[in-house]
Amino acid sequence: MATGSKKVDEWLTDRYPDIRQQAEESNALIYFADESSVRSDYHSGTTWAKKGCTPIVEATGARFSINMISAVSAEGTMRYMTIPGRFNTDVFICFLKQLVTSHDRPIIVVTDGPPAHKAKKVQKYIEQEPRLLGVHILPAYSPELNPDESVWGYLKSGHLGRMTLRTKGQFLRAVRTCLKSLQRLPRKIQGFFRSEHTAYACLETFV
């Protein structure tokens, strides 16, 4: 369990249990959200070569990047959105709208604290949207508390990092295919909530 700072301890012992209680009383679904970017020249893992030869990872020389945002729940659901430009407040609100319209129950969002997440426009949207019960900010410098961080590890290290993508179109399709494949793996997503630092948010924690 992630501990070691007053803010983290407060999150684990007070703030998140209160959020969880609100979710139970309202039959709300808690989503942990995060955004990231990935480049087409990212490589991970290992490759092979004949004995005595240096392994070479194939690269195309072309570089593309895509910004993304995703959210996962301890129930194994996931939502995501690829972003053609930069991430900003309007994009975050658009994603929040996608979350609340894709479920027939209230939504609570937990995320980190960049300015786009705490802007006045976001607060105004929350006030006007009864299906969104709140956007709660994780303690600063504590990404390990966010189960959604595992989405990017799955995407970059497990899939994209082993591909050779020659065009921006191929790259975008590969990103969306990987995210969609993960969306169809609820048990995999639930596993993101069972690591040392995210187990506090696992459903079994509250049984």
Protein language model features and the residues they cover:
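Short functional hotspots at interaction and active-site rims
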Residues: 1-207
